[in-house]
């Protein structure tokens, strides 16, 4: 009877050892996955920083481009109005030659 009890205890100890070894393997596997996940998160952080910098630069370039276009449009409108004003002045203001006729 003591021999059977000893065998049962030995089997239980072997089972516990096997379970512990499986758990240890799972812990090592999980550690590897966590390391890989940490590397990926670091890469994503670097990529997001680069993306943020690029978007800020692009937004600033577009802002200046918009301002430049508005200035050119304003100058074109002012030039057009000036041209219209000159044409109207030439047409409607009497010239010196017309006033000397009897």
Swiss-Prot record:
GO CC terms in record: cell surface; cytoplasmic vesicle membrane; intercalated disc; late endosome; organelle membrane; perinuclear region of cytoplasm; plasma membrane; trans-Golgi network
InterPro entries linked: Synaptobrevin-like, Synaptobrevin/VAMP, V_SNARE_CC, Vamp5, VAMP5_R-SNARE
Induction of its expression: During myogenesis.
Pfam families: Synaptobrevin
Sites bearing Phosphoserine, chain numbering: 41, 48-49
Keywords, sorted A to Z: Cell membrane, Coiled coil, Developmental protein, Differentiation, Golgi apparatus, Membrane, Myogenesis, Phosphoprotein, Transmembrane, Transmembrane helix
Residues in compartment: Vesicular: 94-102
Record's bilayer topology term: Single-pass type IV membrane protein
Spans traversing the lipid bilayer: 73-93
Location(s) in or outside the cell: Cell membrane; Endomembrane system; Golgi apparatus, trans-Golgi network membrane
Topology Cytoplasmic: residue spans: 1-72
Primary subcellular site in the record, as a coarse category: membrane
PROSITE patterns: SYNAPTOBREVIN, V_SNARE
GO BP annotations, alphabetical order: cell differentiation; Golgi to plasma membrane protein transport; skeletal muscle tissue development
Domain v-SNARE coiled-coil homology: 5-65
Similarity comment: Belongs to the synaptobrevin family.
Annotated function: May participate in trafficking events that are associated with myogenesis, such as myoblast fusion and/or GLUT4 trafficking.
PANTHER family noted in UniProt: VESICLE-ASSOCIATED MEMBRANE PROTEIN 5
Protein name: Vesicle-associated membrane protein 5
Lineage, top ranks: Eukaryota, Metazoa, Chordata, Craniata, Vertebrata
Name of the gene encoding the protein in the UniProt record: Vamp5
């Amino acid at each position: 009877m003591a021999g059977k009890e000893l065998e049962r205890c030995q089997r239980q100890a072997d089972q516990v050892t096997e379970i512990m070894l499986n758990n240890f393997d799972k812990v090592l596997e999980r550690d590897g996955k966590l390391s890989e996940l940490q590397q990926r998160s670091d890469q994503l952080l670097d990529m997001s920083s680069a993306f943020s910098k690029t978007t800020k630069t692009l937004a600033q370039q577009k802002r200046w481009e918009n301002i430049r276009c508005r200035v050119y449009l304003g100058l074109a409108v002012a030039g057009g109005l000036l041209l219209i004003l000159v044409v109207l002045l030439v047409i409607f203001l009497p010239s010196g030659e017309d006033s000397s006729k009897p």
